[in-house]
Amino acid sequence: MITVVTIPRSVSWKGDAIAVLNQTKLPHSTEYKTLTTIEEVWKSIVMLEVRGAPAIGIVAAFGLALASKKYTTLHIEEFQKKFNRDCNYLGTSRPTAVNLFWAIDRMRESIQEITTIKEAQKILEEEALRIQQEDEAVCRSIGEHALTCFKDGDNILTICNAGSIATARYGTALAPFYIGKEKGVHLHAYACETRPVLQGGRLTTWELKQAGIDVTLITDNTAAHAIQTKEINAIIVGADRIVANGDTANKIGTMNLAILAKYFDIPFYVAAPLSTFDITKQTGAEIVIEERDETEVTKIFGKQVAPVGTTVYNPAFDVTPNELITGIITEQGIIRGDYKREIASLFEKTS
């Protein structure tokens, strides 16, 4: 029996505006925010109202389609100049998430041969919708492949939120939970709360509960103890950037889990679409790591919890070395072994 799973949508195109699920309001209220300018799109990404590498790429694509609509009276050369400026502007919002730049480049390339602004506007809207539709299919495929790594009743640990609200639908790391639910395969999620912004506590638990999937929330510090005492069978995480040798940038704390997985001899999987790969970079040392505002650490929900003036180091991501990764699950299948060779081979086949 197939179960229909209700999954919330993160981004919706309204023709003259973008509706985004405001993730800063979760889990207390489900509010969709309307974005009507590229400046609002940029701010929504920076403020984490929309987040998750694929979702950021989707909203950026819609943002460029939206911005193009205000340039109707320009000459085509001036249109291209302003459009390129908008592309560069959106690229400053989140430097680590490669899907952002992938989507921007794809939108830019889609109108290279246009001769009229009306044609460009039509193509940009169609391309943004295509990016969203493709991401949903990609995430479902990731979920299908990931589900082959697990069995009914498995306890699986994750961090941050690589779920439906971080993508077009299904998510990456959470996709096997949804596909499993549809197929009657019961997987139990253990979600790290994910300090300092609590994406695990606020978002992963919220969306899995919405879908009726079993989830247990733990503090980040509990991960080792949970693996030791709760029969955790595997760890699965998403990714914000995977480079040519398989080194993976993901939410800060991910590398901690990879090290624990190696110690306890359980599989550590990364789930991500091919659009998250950056094969122009050879190792994780080349990845630019975003550092965020100190108040994310010194305050919790606006309340000061550390002495004023405390020095803070607040990187948003860390880089997990490829040797700690059991497999990278993509829409094309699972990459294992010699990541540099296998990733190069995969991109040769798909190019």
UniProtKB/Swiss-Prot annotation:
Substrate binds at R51, G52, A53, R94, Q199, N250, K251. Keywords: Amino-acid biosynthesis, Isomerase, Methionine biosynthesis. The active site is at D240. It catalyses: 5-(methylsulfanyl)-alpha-D-ribose 1-phosphate = 5-(methylsulfanyl)-D-ribulose 1-phosphate. The keyword Amino-acid biosynthesis applies. Pfam families: IF-2B. Its EC number is 5.3.1.23. GO terms for molecular function: S-methyl-5-thioribose-1-phosphate isomerase activity. It is an enzyme of class 5 (isomerase). GO terms for biological process: L-methionine salvage from methylthioadenosine. Pathway: Amino-acid biosynthesis; L-methionine biosynthesis via salvage pathway; L-methionine from S-methyl-5-thio-alpha-D-ribose 1-phosphate: step 1/6. The record marks C160 as: Transition state stabilizer. InterPro entries: IF-2B-related, IF-M1Pi, IF_2B-like_C, Initiation_fac_2B_a/b/d, M1Pi_N, NagB/RpiA_transferase-like. Belongs to the EIF-2B alpha/beta/delta subunits family. MtnA subfamily. Homodimer. Catalyzes the interconversion of methylthioribose-1-phosphate (MTR-1-P) into methylthioribulose-1-phosphate (MTRu-1-P). This is Methylthioribose-1-phosphate isomerase. It comes from Bacillus cereus (strain ZK / E33L). The lineage of its organism: Bacteria, Bacillati, Bacillota, Bacilli, Bacillales.
